Amino acid sequence: MKGEFLTARDIQKILGVKQAKSYDIIRTLNAQMKEEGYMVIQGKVSRAKFEECYCYKGPKSQTG
């Protein structure tokens, strides 16, 4: 999961959703990006767009 793009499997692991839901998320985010004028890759979504929309920043530290 270190690349610029996330797959349905990556989204399943991050959000704990089923495969169908993860593909729905990808379709929704890619549609938004198309409206903004970006080129998209079917079946993958920009990690930056996903993090922007889902406020996901990875595991939080247990210290502090």
From Swiss-Prot:
GO-annotated molecular function: DNA binding
Coiled-coil region list: none
Lyase recorded as keyword: no
The entry's keywords: DNA integration, DNA recombination, DNA-binding
Protein origin, superkingdom: Bacteria
NCBIfam families xrefs: ICEBs1XisBacil
Role played: Required for the excision of the integrative and conjugative element ICEBs1. Excision of ICEBs1 requires two sites, attL and attR, at the left and right ends of the integrated ICEBs1.
Protein name: ICEBs1 excisionase
Organism of derivation: Bacillus subtilis (strain 168)
